[in-house]
Swiss-Prot record:
Organism: Nostoc sp. (strain PCC 7120 / SAG 25.82 / UTEX 2576)
Positions of ATP binding: 205, 296, 327, 356-359
Protein's UniProt name: Phosphoglycerate kinase
GO cellular component, one term: cytosol
Top-tier EC class: transferase
Reaction catalyzed: (2R)-3-phosphoglycerate + ATP = (2R)-3-phospho-glyceroyl phosphate + ADP
Chain residues that bind substrate: 24-26, 40, 63-66, 121, 154
Length: 400
């Protein structure tokens, strides 16, 4: 699915026009209301700067947290301040996202100026994709740009509803890059293609695993979900996390991999803990020797070697989900080793894609984010795209 992009709009097309740009400025704040990580704001800069340089009047819309109505703590004021610093120009901030105050401020905008609307989720109509609310949001603009990949899997008023009232509706640079990497990895990858899927639950990754079994040459599984596979094989897993209702599914996934000739790799050894704590006692054992009363919190060193060998000849790797409880330093070695491995194979031309969520945090923790080909900004959106699902916020944009 090829979408029309902001890059295709010329200055002649949009100079003096009002652009409604959906961004994802849902950034973390500390107790004092200071932004602790501005990655999402920086990610939107290429689109904003492109529009201002082409002479558009830029109106930004974002959600922030999960407010139930107006919440003073969830106003976008700190975001406007940070964005002003990053752009090197004043960002005008409104106290609402629709209505007379907004219309009045938009009317004063000069070409190349930027205005940030208040948190669109202050209205419950946003998440209900209410057409009247979408119409009011769209009333102050001439065309629409979606650069909020992280919410593209939601059909909300500011991601989907507004496209019915604004034309053209196009993808921003961030959304374009996400589609380029995540879709081509699934639809037309350089092979061999390997996927590394981690995380604690099989249930949350079933769709991705099933899709990837159709597309991948190798599938590596780590994280807490491995114990559901082991138990399905009849192994003792101690008090490790197991989804009892997914044992048959685990068996069928292994059978499906075999049938398709996909190399499905599970860890050969695990790091165990006597309880779920950063300072727990630990021991490393092979998967056949997990004693009662212990729980697995990371993959072991032998597994790391096996996975490294499997990844050595790959041309494309998608990684979604950690290998263990990497928040605890004692149980972070497996996840960190995978991050280092991807950085290494990336140097020899392998495309490395970090598919959102906790694996992004893991790569950032070890300082290797800039050595990956692509780091997805979406959690749920990345997963759904990798599953081959249609994302409403993308589907609503104009075809190229």
């Amino acid at each position: 699915m090829s979408k029309k992009t902001v890059a295709s709009l010329s200055a002649a097309d949009i100079s003096g026009k009002r652009a409604l740009v959906r961004v994802d400025f849902n950034v973390p704040l500390d107790d004092q209301g200071n932004i602790t990580d501005d990655t999402r704001i920086r990610a939107a800069l290429p689109t904003i700067q492109d529009l201002t340089q082409k002479g558009a009047k830029v109106i930004l819309a974002s959600h922030f947290g999960r407010p139930k109505g107006v919440d003073e703590k969830l106003r976008l004021t700190p975001v406007a301040k940070r964005l002003s610093e990053l752009l090197g120009q004043e960002v005008i901030k409104t106290d609402d996202s629709i209505g007379d105050e907004v219309a009045a401020k938009v009317a004063t905008l000069q070409n190349g100026q930027v205005l940030l609307l208040e948190n669109v989720r202050f209205y419950k109509e946003e998440e209900k994709n209410d057409p009247e609310f979408a119409k009011k949001l769209a009333a102050n603009a001439d065309f629409y740009v979606n650069d909020a990949f992280g919410t593209a899997h939601r059909a909300h008023a500011s991601t989907e509803g507004v496209t019915k009232f604004l034309s053209p509706s196009v993808a921003g640079y961030l959304v374009e890059k996400e589609l380029q990497y995540l879709q081509s990895a699934i639809e037309n990858p350089q092979r061999p293609l390997a996927a590394i899927i981690g995380g604690s639950k099989v249930s949350s990754k079933i769709g991705v695993i099933e899709t990837l079994l159709e597309k991948c040459d190798k599938l590596i599984i780590g994280g807490g979900m491995i114990f559901t596979f082991y138990k399905a094989r009849g192994l003792n897993v101690g008090k490790s996390l197991v989804e009892e209702d997914k044992l048959e599914l685990a068996k069928s996934l292994e059978a499906k991999a075999k049938e398709r000739g996909v190399s499905l790799l599970l860890p050969t050894d695990v790091v165990l803990a006597d309880n779920f704590a950063p300072d727990a006692n630990s021991q490393t054992v092979s998967i056949e020797n997990i004693p009662d009363g212990w729980m697995g919190l990371d993959i072991g060193p032998d597994s790391v070697k096996v996975f490294q060998a499997a990844l050595a000849d790959t041309k494309t790797v998608i990684w979604n989900g950690p290998m263990g409880v990497f928040e605890f330093d004692k149980f972070a070695a497996g996840t960190e080793a995978i991050a280092h491995t991807l950085a290494e194979i990336g140097k020899t031309g392998t495309t490395t894609i970090i598919g959102g969520g906790d694996s992004v945090a893991a790569v950032e923790k070890v300082g290797l984010a800039d050595q990956m080909s692509h780091i997805s900004t979406g959690g749920g959106a990345s997963l759904e795209l990798l599953e081959g699902k249609v994302l409403p916020g993308i589907a609503a944009l104009d075809e190229a």
